[in-house]
Amino acid sequence: MKIPHIPVLLKEVIDSFKGVGDGYFVDCTLGYGGHSKEMLKQYPNIQHIGIDRDDEALEFSKDRLSQYSHRSRLYKGTFANILPTLEESPIVGVLADFGVSSLQLDKKERGFAFDSDTLDMRMDASAKLSAYNVVNEYSKERLEYILDNYGEVRAYKRVASAIVEARASSPISSAKELTQIALSVLPQGGKIHPATLMFQAIRIEVNSELQEIEGLLDALENRHYKDEVVSLISFHSLEDRLVKNRFKKWTKKCICDSHAIRCTCSRDNDIGKALSSKPIVASKEELKINPRSRSAKLRSFRFNANR
């Protein structure tokens, strides 16, 4: 079986779950099963649940994890929707890798790559909204909003204007064409491709990625898991900021108003602790093998046993 994707921070992810008890491990972003297979191998007492919205990834992982079929079950859907509905107990570990898989990036027909002849970017091929819809149907103001807020594109107004101007004559039908628009208005020669942040913004909009992460964090907070480890891998500042801020909230003992003269709460409102003070990043050795791991940041959190 040819493996189409190298899991990032594999050793670091596996190590983050050391000491978890018997129970269910949930891989919220199953992808091509790299992290899940190693977890099943290293932790023989866990049961596995895999979630993904990509049919191709689910089929591949079903085959790849077949030797563990008696310990594994797979669900299609978004993790923000499925995790809150799981009845399996106890859940002792949750993993989410928010990155786009190498196969999704490399398969031209998926429309994620700069030189794709299609304009799609859907992680779930059955979803209604695609990059084509965003680029050709959104107002200039809405395009400005997503380019600014989801891509942090400095010249977001200029890029939005260029898109609207280009589609006025004929629809923008390929990622390749969209890339050329970016190249025509954005400076070149930087560390990343000029179209990178524009593509990021559109992909986030198409797949509701930030809303999904918020939904996952809400589910983790509201389900009152006990002695559970959560490991989350982000790939850009917007994702990492959401995770970092939520972990900070979860470790806060005092919830009194910042202007209060004295503390009137019980000062025991923390629900766990972060397992490292800073995010874990790829080693030099991993970067040589898998350059796409350069942006990956792993943050882990352990909920209190008496929560």
For the regions a protein language model found, what residue spans apply to each?
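S-adenosyl-L-methionine-dependent methyltransferase catalytic core, i.e., the SAM/SAH-binding region
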Residues: 1-307
